[in-house]
Amino acid sequence: MALRLLKLAATSASARVVAAGAQRVRGVHSSVQCKLRYGMWHFLLGDKASKRLTERSRVITVDGNICTGKGKLAKEIAEKLGFKHFPEAGIHYPDSTTGDGKPLAADYNGNCSLEKFYDDPRSNDGNSYRLQSWLYSSRLLQYSDALEHLLTTGQGVVLERSIFSDFVFLEAMYNQGFIRKQCVDHYNEVKSVTICDYLPPHLVIYIDVPVPEVQRRIQKKGDPHEMKITSAYLQDIENAYKKTFLPEMSEKCEVLQYSAREAQDSKKAVEDIEYLKFDKGPWLKQDNRTLYHLRLLVQDKFEVLNYTSIPIFLPEVTIGAHQTDRVLHQFRELPGRKYSPGYNTEVGDKWIWLK
């Protein structure tokens, strides 16, 4: 079985079918940020990024291991700075941001399960890599939504993790023997042709919580699936953060690190942010022209996801054409998923002929 986020139609349906190899799926995701498409004439007539971007127009990501308090800190920072908070993108991110907001069946969401990964990370049906591949695509969509919001409104954004830190889970999975080397190669190929078009965050905040404390928090939380996570897996995640992610990001953006105790004080974090100079990274080299092209990219979800589908056969994420067509047909039969919002009579849309 395989996962792929493919072809986007002009609908705002949140489906993205399990597919791979030759699979292309319509009716996936449309932006919730801006209904009127931005284009060349807007730019020529004066709608340029420099008119709305200010020193508060920042992209901040909050990173850390599992159960380190990322969500709480990210939300509080966003509230104090007046930024928009983007909770961590999960399997159902497309469902939560489009359509009626309700989660769809696994067939329309990568045919993967986080709970199954925790219960049986070495499952021979390929669930572990399907999950990781799907989550990368979900983070890619979310990051494009966040950048679109920033460029459209000028309001800063705060995310929990991003496409730039997603690889830490891949490395941990591989080190623990959950996925094959071919899966790592496939992931890196997809990442290399997708992430290159995106600017990194202005700031990365890393919450450093020791593995024993992470495990204690997981046990206290009481999720029966998460409680099966091994200390070795958590340690590999931490190692990937500290040995690869943080050194790489420190060359591209500002980095702040906090202990578990320090992360409880969001007021102090905001003060630290306001003292930063933000004097490094590719954002400094951008002008109206480059930001215009970036905005065109992030509003086009077809283009955002286009290169997540590459012609490489990988059993974990590949299904046949007949199954792809079957799942797509089933999706189009769901209430409100056949046409664009406002044009589906089966969900009560009226006066369609006047629209």
From Swiss-Prot:
GO terms for biological process: mitochondrial electron transport, NADH to ubiquinone. InterPro entries: Deoxyribonucleoside_kinase, DNK_dom, NDUFA10, P-loop_NTPase. Residues 1-35 form a transit peptide. Its main location: mitochondrion. Its cofactor is FAD. CDD domains: NDUO42. Gene3D superfamilies: P-loop containing nucleotide triphosphate hydrolases. GO terms for cellular component: cytoplasm; mitochondrial matrix; respiratory chain complex I. It holds the Pfam family dNK. It is found in: Mitochondrion matrix. Phosphorylation at Ser-250 by PINK1 is required for the binding and/or reduction of the complex I substrate ubiquinone. Keywords: Electron transport, FAD, Flavoprotein, Mitochondrion, Phosphoprotein, Respiratory chain, Transit peptide, Transport. The modification Phosphoserine is found at S250. Binds 1 FAD per subunit. The modification N6-succinyllysine is found at K285. It comes from the Eukaryota. Accessory subunit of the mitochondrial membrane respiratory chain NADH dehydrogenase (Complex I), that is believed not to be involved in catalysis. Complex I functions in the transfer of electrons from NADH to the respiratory chain. The immediate electron acceptor for the enzyme is believed to be ubiquinone. Belongs to the complex I NDUFA10 subunit family. Complex I is composed of 45 different subunits. This a component of the hydrophobic protein fraction. This is NADH dehydrogenase [ubiquinone] 1 alpha subcomplex subunit 10, mitochondrial. It comes from Pan troglodytes (Chimpanzee). The lineage of its organism: Eukaryota, Metazoa, Chordata, Craniata, Vertebrata. The gene is NDUFA10.
